[in-house]
Amino acid sequence: MTIYLPELEQEHDASFPDIESALHDPDGLLAMGGDLTPKRLLLAYSHGIFPWYSNDDPILWWSPSIRGVFIPENYTPSKSLKKFFKKSGYSITINHATSDVISLCASTRPAEETWIMPEMIEAYQNLAKLGHCHSVEVWFNNELVGGLYGLQIGQVFCGESMFSIKTNASKIALWKFCEHFVAFGGKLIDCQMMNPHLESLGAIPMERPIFNERLQVFSAISVFENCYQPQSLSNG
């Protein structure tokens, strides 16, 4: 089957097609090409668009009809996770090792399963240097054993990926970030594509028009000052 996709130009024009023009099959595929400059990435995320592609593909841009999201104020960890954390010896930080978290999200996956290409790693590390990309780290005996990273768009956190080297590390990173994010005025965590794993963690599906309506409202309001300052959250 032949499909038509708008092809984005590099550098000169960072605009995107209307998200309602995204394909139904594959669901949410909107455009191809362009680049991963900070300007384009920030524009994309502010309109509910994100890059997702494999090694042999051009850059592909998506806005799925059903979005996976966490409502952080409604997030409730399981009793078993709470019990585990108390005895875990884990410590949780924000923005202590963003570059390492991004790299580990790529390297801890089998090569054929990761979409985090070297150019993606570089792009998000550049966004971190500019203050737009942030991470949550889980440490055990001073070793980085889990975490997550994503982009800040006002009161929305656009989660990109997470990793876990030791038991429950990524689940605890998510839990502790939800608590922190709510305390600083955060409203929504975007998980992009809904899948069974995210659903098992508490993500819910949200239709594209509703997601983008909330994105436009929440992205216009900043979280409280110091939300993303490097800091410690809690210790197990």
From Swiss-Prot:
GO terms for cellular component: cytoplasm. Its EC number is 2.3.2.6. Its main location: cytoplasm. It holds the Pfam family Leu_Phe_trans. The keyword DNA-binding does not apply. The keyword rRNA processing does not apply. GO terms for molecular function: leucyl-tRNA--protein transferase activity. It is found in: Cytoplasm. One of its GO terms (biological process) is protein catabolic process. Signal peptide: none annotated. It is an enzyme of class 2 (transferase). It catalyses: N-terminal L-lysyl-[protein] + L-leucyl-tRNA(Leu) = N-terminal L-leucyl-L-lysyl-[protein] + tRNA(Leu) + H(+); N-terminal L-arginyl-[protein] + L-leucyl-tRNA(Leu) = N-terminal L-leucyl-L-arginyl-[protein] + tRNA(Leu) + H(+); L-phenylalanyl-tRNA(Phe) + an N-terminal L-alpha-aminoacyl-[protein] = an N-terminal L-phenylalanyl-L-alpha-aminoacyl-[protein] + tRNA(Phe). Keywords: Acyltransferase, Cytoplasm, Transferase. SUPFAM superfamilies: Acyl-CoA N-acyltransferases (Nat). Belongs to the L/F-transferase family. PANTHER family: LEUCYL/PHENYLALANYL-TRNA--PROTEIN TRANSFERASE (PTHR30098), LEUCYL_PHENYLALANYL-TRNA--PROTEIN TRANSFERASE (PTHR30098:SF2). Functions in the N-end rule pathway of protein degradation where it conjugates Leu, Phe and, less efficiently, Met from aminoacyl-tRNAs to the N-termini of proteins containing an N-terminal arginine or lysine. This is Leucyl/phenylalanyl-tRNA--protein transferase. It comes from Aliivibrio salmonicida (strain LFI1238) (Vibrio salmonicida (strain LFI1238)).
